[in-house]
């Protein structure tokens, strides 16, 4: 699923979909690992969360979801993990862009 400008059609759409919904860990060359879906404490050696890469550490704040195992914790000020496992019975998290405040509501 490596990106290159010549990707077209379904191959291009598949790569984009994978980047937006499945990217969690990368190796030193930036290749995505699709196997690990758990907590960072259990990640395979040699892999790095995408939000800790040099490219992601720019001056922009990044809000993301679809990684409930993080339980909203990234350890990075610029990376805000919004998926706190509501569908698994934990909580739903919202982020206020104006104030930077996180609000959580326990799952019903």
Please report, for each region that a protein language model flagged, where it lies by residue.
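Feature recognizes metal-dependent phosphohydrolase scaffolds
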Residues: 1-108
């Amino acid at each position: 699923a490596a990106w290159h400008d010549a990707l077209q059609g379904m191959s291009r759409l598949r790569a984009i979909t994978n980047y937006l919904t499945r990217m969690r860990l990368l190796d030193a060359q930036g290749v995505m690992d699709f196997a690990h879906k758990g907590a960072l404490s259990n990640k395979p050696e040699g892999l790095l969360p995408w939000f800790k890469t040099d490219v992601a550490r720019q001056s922009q704040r990044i809000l993301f979801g679809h990684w409930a195992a993080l339980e909203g914790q990234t350890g990075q000020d610029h990376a805000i993990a919004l998926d706190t496992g509501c569908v698994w019975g934990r909580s739903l998290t919202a982020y206020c862009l104006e104030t930077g405040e996180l609000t959580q509501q326990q799952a019903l």
